[in-house]
């Protein structure tokens, strides 16, 4: 790693790489319900999706995330339409500002769901409340870690059973964001 320009991204389920990453000046991102480190599940850069409309691809991700947040059940057509509409709405200002400024969060997304008239929107908002305003809201806040370091270690040891599927989705999406930037 020291002799190349390559970026190295590690997903560490057993906390085996922390000492090495620290010694090499990398960023260790501890992910858990109680960690002060946060990755915004809705982070998105201009290149997200490799040339396609980033919001369309992010909407697909948010649908997958909502499926996990709701309990792994498949979303119906109405729910998908509502999620797609709300995703486009919360990203509108960010997109109009050429993907600069404050990135929306899952809290913004939930607030947008609550503005909708359909009862299904209220149901989705209630189902994701634990992950936006409750004790498992670690992915509903602005990112406060350096995801641009050449060496990143996502430490997922303390993620826990409830957050593991969601955490893996968010970590992989964060990595996609990083890869498409390059």
State where each predicted segment sits.
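Glycine-rich phosphate-binding P-loop
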Residues: 1
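Hydrophobic multi-pass inner-membrane translocation pores used for secretion
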Residues: 5, 29-31
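Conserved RecA-like ASCE P-loop NTPase motor core of nucleic-acid helicases/translocases
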Residues: 7-11
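P-loop NTPase motor domains
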Residues: 15-26, 33-35, 40-182
């Amino acid at each position: 790693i020291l002799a190349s320009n390559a970026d190295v991204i590690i997903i560490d389920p057993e906390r085996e790489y922390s000492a090495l990453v620290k010694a090499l000046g990398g960023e260790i991102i501890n992910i858990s319900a109680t960690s002060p480190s946060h990755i915004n599940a809705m982070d998105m850069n201009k290149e997200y999706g490799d040339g396609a409309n980033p919001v369309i691809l992010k909407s697909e991700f948010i649908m997958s995330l909502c499926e996990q947040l709701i309990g792994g059940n498949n979303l119906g057509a109405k729910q998908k339409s509502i999620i797609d509409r709300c995703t486009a709405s919360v990203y509108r200002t960010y997109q109009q500002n050429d993907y600069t400024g404050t990135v929306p969060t899952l809290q913004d997304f939930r607030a947008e769901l609550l503005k909708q008239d359909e009862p299904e929107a209220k149901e989705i908002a209630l189902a994701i409340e634990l992950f936006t305003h409750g004790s498992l809201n670690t992915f509903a806040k602005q990112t406060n870690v350096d995801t641009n370091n050449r060496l990143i270690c996502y430490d997922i040891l303390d993620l826990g059973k409830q957050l593991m599927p969601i955490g893996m989705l968010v970590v992989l999406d964060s990595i996609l964001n990083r890869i498409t930037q390059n």
